[in-house]
Design a protein with these regions (language model features):
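Short, Lys/Arg-enriched N-terminal segments with co-localized hydrophobic residues
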Residues: 2-14
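Extended, low-polarity segments enriched in aliphatic/aromatic residues
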Residues: 16-67, 71-75, 85-93, 99-357
Length: 357
């Protein structure tokens, strides 16, 4: 068990480096990795949080169907059991996705979670999809000192919780460089409309070949921006549309989609502000497991070979310091040869700018 002082600092009465606790994955005979997770959480101070009689949201990613890189449910049970020992009422949670797949509404999302092993017998607590059936059950909360987002649209169950814990699989990501704690919180806790605000600078579009003409999207639109053409296909008036994304959640046929046109730099900034909104004003604790470091997000229905060796478990009260510590550890690791990163490094003239992500 090691403690490291991350390079980020928290603003208190006096400035001091944030503490991030770390343990590796080495488990000699008689040593349990699950016990090591428990011990690093305790060392980092999870038992300092008063959980007695309080709802505890444990935010994690249940993995897209077909993906095998997501965190095992056994890890979630360790964290849930720690919460229950302290009198807490934990639940695992995530929000619906903006795009088509196996997690775009609560019913499919719950089925996906169960098929991937997340249900009360394996995790010790219930699973709640935080933004409801269609991804429209949200709370609009202020962003502290927000520059790019003044408010954030967060899954209501997450904001209803008294305590927030993130349990993150740290890996690569095709848009944000890496997917860590801030992404798990910021993007993951956004409702479908919240995800659209982070991803897109514009408005949703209609793929008319998929439109069934059911008119449900028009009923959900608060701006009267949706009409129907001569073929009974939805048309969005971009001059009236406010970009709330409720029509995306209303469509059962994946006919309405976000253009996802925010630049990656802007996406990262919005995501960080959303994470700040989720964490503000209540006790929070964060755990990241740096293992099965796939090059892309667990949102894919597949996962490529890891680009780096398994590194360890990190825990902290500071999500920024936690991401910094995980990223630093990855940048100091030797890339694996039979991987996307290893193959890229072997290409003549390919430049990774000293960054494994």
């Amino acid at each position: 068990m090691r403690q490291c002082a991350a390079s980020t600092k928290r603003r208190r009465k006096t400035m001091e480096a944030s503490k991030v606790y770390y343990t590796d994955f080495r488990c000699p005979v008689g040593t349990s990795l699950l016990d090591k997770l428990r011990r690093v959480c305790i060392a980092a101070g999870i038992k300092d949080i008063d959980m007695d009689g309080k709802f505890v949201a444990i935010k994690m990613h249940f993995g897209e169907l077909g993906n095998l890189a997501f965190l095992r449910p056994n890890y979630a049970k360790v964290v849930a059991d720690l919460c229950k020992e302290q009198g807490g009422l934990p639940f695992l949670t995530d929000c619906n996705t903006l795009y088509p797949g196996s997690r775009k509404n609560a019913l499919e999302h719950l089925t996906c979670a169960q098929l991937n092993g997340f249900w009360p017998m394996t995790t010790g607590c219930q699973v709640i999809i935080a933004d409801g059936l269609r991804g429209t059950d949200e709370a609009e909360v202020p962003v502290p000192n927000g520059e790019y987002c003044k408010t954030a649209k967060i899954g209501r169950a997450i904001m209803d919780a008294d305590i927030f814990i993130s349990l993150t699989h740290f890996k690569g990501h095709e848009s944000t460089g890496f997917g860590g704690t801030l992404k798990n919180i910021g993007m993951g806790c956004g409702s479908r409309a919240g995800k659209m605000i982070q991803h897109a600078a514009g408005h949703p579009e209609v793929q008319q070949s998929l439109c069934r003409g059911c008119h449900r999207c028009a009923k959900e639109c608060g701006s009267d921006a949706i009409t129907y053409d001569a073929n009974n296909k939805a048309v969005i008036d971009q001059t009236k549309c406010k970009g709330c994304g409720r029509c995306i959640g209303a469509c059962n046929f994946d006919a309405i989609y976000s253009q996802c046109d925010s630049a990656n730099e802007m996406l990262d900034r919005k995501m960080a502000e959303y994470a700040a909104a989720v964490c503000a004003g209540r006790p929070c604790f964060h755990v990241s497991l740096v293992q099965d470091i796939s090059p892309n997000c667990d949102c894919h229905g597949e996962n490529d070979a890891p680009i780096l060796p398994d590194i360890g478990i990190f825990a902290s009260f500071d999500p920024v310091a936690l991401d910094q510590a995980c990223a630093d550890a990855c940048l100091n690791a030797q890339p694996l040869p039979n991987s996307q990163l290893g193959q890229n490094l072997a290409k003549p003239g390919w430049n990774c700018h000293h960054d494994n992500f």
